[in-house]
Structures are given as structure tokens and as C-alpha cells.
Design a protein with these regions (language model features):
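C-terminal catalytic "cap/lid" subdomain
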Residues: 1-237
């Protein structure tokens, strides 16, 4: 039984690198693609926002001497590369997929138009949103929140390397406790670090629930779509 009919799946670029520091892991790409196909075959409309951290992070570019706007623009271009890689892998499994970018690049991908994106979903296509918001100073989490609200998704599902939100770093503390649910206010006031404040605030204002879960574990995207308790849900109350 499916809990969500339309999902915005936010994937980190770093996850695509697998155990490498840079680039793509074919194993991770294929795992994500297979999971997305399984969810798609159940009749779920699925849109994806993917980060670019496996190629370039705008904020870290400042350490290399780039100004923030240039660095963020390079990061947005990295998300397009990731989007194309994921599109190719999903389509190899026979699932029709469209990449839509907020940056004009007509030879490479469709320009993002909200109504057209919704139409693609209604026609049974997976849609990958790339190019961030096209504006610097906004993270791909903010882009994910924005697109989730725009396409009227039922949930913003943030796929990470950990199985939810903890009261402290589970990698460092054995006694870390996972939250089943937290409110938006708690996530912001406690600075839990799951998303930036802009993304959380946008979801709070539009009552867009967020589920944080481990997307690297095979089958978890479908379990999330079915409403299984495999992560942490952030909601208004």
C-alpha cells in the first residue's frame, strides 16, 4: 500500500561518488536507478533533485579562490552532469526520464517550466530537476524544497547516508538516539543540520512534510513511499 502518490526525492551528489572522493560510482547509480524503477512501477510519480557535491561544491570553491557566485554557478552545472548520468542509468532500465534545468541549456536538457514538469509526471515519466534554482546562495536542499512545493508533491524525501535524524552524530557517539518525528520548529531551533534554514522554512510555511532516510540501502525508497518507519519525519506538529 502506497502512502505517497507524488514524491520529490532529494539525493546528495556526494552519495553518487560511493567510496570515491570524486566522480561517479556505477554501483550507486545503478542502485538508485533500480530503486527508482521499482517505485515508478508501483504507480508513484517521482521527481528528483540531485546535488553536485561529488563534482564541485560552490561553498568550498571559495577556499580555492573563487567568488561565491562563480562557485555556486559551477556547482549548479555539476548538478546537470549528475542529472544526465542518472537519466541515462534510469533509461537503460526502460523508464522514460526527462532532465529539466533551471539554467538555459537547450541542447542538453529541457528548460524547467512548472506546468510542463507536472505534465511529464502525469504521463508517467521520471523528472530530474537540475541546475538548482539558477540563483547563487541557494543550496540544492532549497531547490528540492522549492520544486516539491511547486509540483505539489505529497512529500519531500531526503535520501542520505544515514537512517534519519539523531540527537548527535551517530558516527561518533554509540548512544546517539534517532528521532522518529520532529517538528520544523525543533529542526530549526536545535540546528539539527538536516537541511538549511531556508529549505526548512519553505517546507514549514507550505506544510510540506520531509522524510529523511538512508537511500543507499536497497529497497528503502520504495519502503519510504509505502510509509514504512525507516527514517525521521519532519512535520508541522
Amino acid at each position: 500500500m502506497l502512502k505517497y502518490k507524488r514524491i520529490l526525492l532529494k539525493l546528495s551528489g556526494e552519495a553518487l561518488a560511493g567510496n570515491k572522493e570524486f566522480g561517479f560510482s556505477n554501483e550507486v547509480l545503478e542502485s538508485f536507478a533500480k530503486q527508482i524503477k521499482d517505485v515508478h512501477e508501483k504507480g508513484v510519480e517521482i521527481a528528483i533533485v540531485i546535488g553536485g557535491g561529488n563534482i564541485f561544491r560552490g561553498i568550498s570553491g571559495m577556499e580555492k579562490g573563487f567568488d561565491r557566485v562563480t562557485g555556486d554557478t559551477m556547482g549548479m552545472l555539476a548538478t546537470i552532469m549528475n542529472g544526465l548520468a542518472l537519466q541515462n542509468t534510469i533509461e537503460n532500465l526502460g523508464v522514460p526520464t526527462r532532465v529539466m534545468t533551471a539554467l538555459q541549456m537547450p541542447q542538453v536538457a529541457e528548460l524547467y517550466i512548472r506546468r510542463k514538469a507536472i505534465r511529464h509526471l502525469e504521463k508517467g515519466r521520471v523528472v530530474i530537476f537540475a541546475g538548482g534554482t539558477s540563483n547563487p546562495y541557494f543550496t540544492t536542499d532549497s531547490s528540492g524544497a522549492l520544486r516539491a512545493v511547486e509540483i505539489q508533491a505529497d512529500v519531500l524525501a531526503k535520501g542520505t547516508k544515514v537512517d534519519g535524524i539523531y540527537d548527535k552524530d551517530p558516527m561518533k557517539f554509540d548512544d546517539a538516539v534517532r528521532y522518529d518525528t520532529v517538528t520544523f520548529d525543533e529542526a530549526i531551533s536545535k540546528n539539527l543540520g538536516v537541511m538549511d534554514t531556508a529549505a526548512l522554512s519553505l517546507c514549514r510555511e507550505n506544510e510540506m512534510p520531509i522524510v529523511v532516510f538512508n537511500a543507499l540501502e536497497e529497497g528503502n525508497i520504495l519502503k519510504m513511499a509505502q510509509g514504512n518507519n525507516i527514517g525521521t519525519t519532519i512535520k508541522k506538529k
